């Protein structure tokens, strides 16, 4: 299906569903933070910090494991995909990319501020365009470039404190920051791969195999980390987190909404939009995260919050108001 041949009502519907995805992913920042904070309260700060990597890998394992189980149970027709080689190939590619992105993001979150994390993660908007140019010879127009830059810049300054400047985002780069940049690159690749794969195979079926692959990779990572770190003695403590409401509730929210529902909608509706336009829509994620954080008292309103929201929304508007002939040219040259 070519993007320029999609009916306006289908494109509009797809845009709304991808907007819903950004709202859900905005909440996941809060849910992940709540789960990590819960581990400190349950296990104690010292132990939680000592086995931080194990807890992170366990969280990713359970998040996608739960999502995979629920998906297979409630979408029986997709089980047919488990017998198809092309579905597994697509799921392997998407699953590996999704696992890499979420795993590196979670590794960095405990040691990075929400503002910097949101900004660096939003770089997948830029990476999507760059990967599209290098792999698919996709033309990026100057209007699209301006939109991407504005959206990325806006996402970056949303969480700055009142007395901070833009430079504060760049002067303290360490391992967590670079892990998040790697996460952003992988998410950009995932968007491109999703666009290509869901054009060829059933979106629901490939979502099922993708979730299974992410679960398996997460299990392998969890076991390797806990063995290498020689922390097998803490396995009982880690598993005991599953009976703690303050840990399991946000975990389930991430699994059912952040992983199952969001990725399902992404795989079904993203194919009706261009990859770069989809990435721009996803740039709204930090806006929702900021709004929700303010609502529940986790964030203070600053001049940077409003300036960032304005720049991000303006960037999206510039992209959406491009001349329709530019859309046609982009898709023709990507074939």
Please identify what each model-predicted range represents.
Residues 48, 105, 124-149, 287-307:
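C-terminal transmembrane-helix exit sites in multi-pass transporters
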Residues 4-5, 34, 38, 65-83, ...:
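Membrane-interface helix-cap regions at the ends of transmembrane helices
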Residues 13-22, 72-104, 174-183, 233-261, ...:
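Loop-to-transmembrane-helix transition segments
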Residues 99-103, 117-123, 194-216, 255-295:
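Helix-helix packing/entry segments at the starts of transmembrane helices
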Residues 22, 30-31, 68-71, 128-129, ...:
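Transmembrane alpha-helical segments that form core, pore/gating elements
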Residues 1-58, 104, 168-196, 334-335:
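Glycine-/small-residue-enriched transmembrane alpha-helix faces in small-molecule transporters
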Residues 38-100, 127, 186-193, 208-228, ...:
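Transmembrane alpha-helices of multi-pass small-molecule transport proteins
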Residues 2-8, 60, 64-65, 143, ...:
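C-terminal-most transmembrane helix of multi-pass membrane proteins
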